[in-house]
């Protein structure tokens, strides 16, 4: 017979991993990583909070213990794109400027980049020449940035 810890241990570890990789995600985003298991995920978030392993900031974002509650808004926006592919995603991870995150879905590598106001030329230069053959998804705040 399995204990409760054995049953939920992997799910709790996966949830803690998501909070650590993408600090500042809100509950809705975290629940999307666990489709069909929202009640379990909510209970695990509460459990991780009580253990002192994560905390929820005043704006609703979840952070690992010891982190400053300052979220990377560009990364949070990029995670929404990832969540559109989450059922097909085999792997995902944060990335370095100008790409905010990368993921594999359906045998393709995707890079999600965020272009902030005033960084258009810099990001364009940094993304020039796609040698890796990845598919790029570019996030902009407004159509005037295109």
Predicted regions and their residues:
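Short amphipathic alpha-helical interaction segments
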Residues: 36-47
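Glycine-centered, phosphate/nucleic-acid-interacting loop/turn motifs that mediate DNA/RNA or nucleotide
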Residues: 52
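DNA-contacting interfaces and partner/effector-binding or oligomerization modules
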Residues: 118-119, 135-142
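Conserved small/polar residues in nucleotide/adenosyl-binding loops
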Residues: 144-146
């Amino acid at each position: 017979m399995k204990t409760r810890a054995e049953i939920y241990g992997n799910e709790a570890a996966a949830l803690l991993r998501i909070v650590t990789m993408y600090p500042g995600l809100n509950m809705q985003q975290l629940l999307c990583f666990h489709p069909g298991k929202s009640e379990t995920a909510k209970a695990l978030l509460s459990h991780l909070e009580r253990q002192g392993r994560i905390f929820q900031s005043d704006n609703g974002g979840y952070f690992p213990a010891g982190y400053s509650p300052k979220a990377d808004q560009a990364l949070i926006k990029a995670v929404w794109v990832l969540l559109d592919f989450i059922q097909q995603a085999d792997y995902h991870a944060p990335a370095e400027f100008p790409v905010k995150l990368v993921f594999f879905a359906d045998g393709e590598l995707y890079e999600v980049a965020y272009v902030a106001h005033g960084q258009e030329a810099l990001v364009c230069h940094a993304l020039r020449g796609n040698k890796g053959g990845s598919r790029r998804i570019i996030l902009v705040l407004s159509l005037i940035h295109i």
